[in-house]
């Protein structure tokens, strides 16, 4: 009799997880409509003819704000599980979270002083 251990279950799960996206992409490739010609390749802007080119350069300040946002968004992702389990973790986890927040505050002050958050 064949007995499955934990590794066989994991490999089966990995195989299925790899197979599902491949099958989905293959099915969409086979079932999609064929090329509709040059009209289908044009840009659609609410039924109007597009004005100007589609390739414009954004100001670098947008990227700086986006980078600062991502840093603090990741902070939220790390602090949420800590806040949920706050009662069970104890004082050491509280000190670690304070150190983590302090590092991010120092980074925010640094970005502020360097002018990364100024729009002028």
Curated annotation (Swiss-Prot):
Q: Which GO terms describe its cellular component?
A: NADH dehydrogenase complex; plasma membrane-derived thylakoid membrane
Going by the record, the broad EC class of this enzyme is translocase
Q: How does it sit in the membrane?
A: Multi-pass membrane protein
The answer to keyword NAD applying to this record is yes
Source domain of life is Bacteria
Major place of localization?
A: membrane
* Location in or out of the cell: Cellular thylakoid membrane
- Spell out where the chain crosses the membrane: 2-22, 64-84, 89-109
Tell me, which GO biological process terms does this entry list? photosynthesis, light reaction
EC number(s) on record? Answer: 7.1.1.-
* Enzymatic reactions: a plastoquinone + NADH + (n+1) H(+)(in) = a plastoquinol + NAD(+) + n H(+)(out); a plastoquinone + NADPH + (n+1) H(+)(in) = a plastoquinol + NADP(+) + n H(+)(out)
Query: A single Gene Ontology molecular function, please?
Result: NADH dehydrogenase (ubiquinone) activity
Which keywords does the record carry? Answer: Membrane, NAD, NADP, Plastoquinone, Quinone, Thylakoid, Translocase, Transmembrane, Transmembrane helix, Transport
- Read off the Pfam families from this record: Oxidored_q4 (PF00507)
Q: What does this protein do?
A: NDH-1 shuttles electrons from an unknown electron donor, via FMN and iron-sulfur (Fe-S) centers, to quinones in the respiratory and/or the photosynthetic chain. The immediate electron acceptor for the enzyme in this species is believed to be plastoquinone. Couples the redox reaction to proton translocation, and thus conserves the redox energy in a proton gradient. Cyanobacterial NDH-1 also plays a role in inorganic carbon-concentration.
User: Member of which family?
Assistant: Belongs to the complex I subunit 3 family.
Oligomeric and partner information: NDH-1 can be composed of about 15 different subunits; different subcomplexes with different compositions have been identified which probably have different functions.
Q: What is this protein called?
A: NAD(P)H-quinone oxidoreductase subunit 3
Organism of provenance: Synechocystis sp. (strain ATCC 27184 / PCC 6803 / Kazusa)
């Amino acid at each position: 009799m064949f007995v499955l251990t934990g590794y066989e279950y994991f490999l089966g799960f990995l195989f299925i997880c790899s197979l599902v996206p491949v099958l989905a992409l293959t099915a969409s490739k086979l079932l999609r409509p064929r090329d509709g010609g040059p009209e289908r390749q044009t840009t659609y802007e609410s039924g109007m003819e597009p004005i100007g080119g589609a390739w414009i350069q954004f100001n670098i300040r947008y990227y700086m704000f986006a980078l600062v946002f991502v840093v603090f968004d990741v902070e939220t992702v790390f602090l949420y599980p800590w806040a949920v389990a706050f009662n069970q973790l104890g004082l050491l986890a509280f000190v670690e979270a304070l150190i983590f927040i302090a590092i991010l505050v120092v980074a925010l002050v640094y970005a502020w002083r360097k002018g990364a958050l100024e729009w002028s």
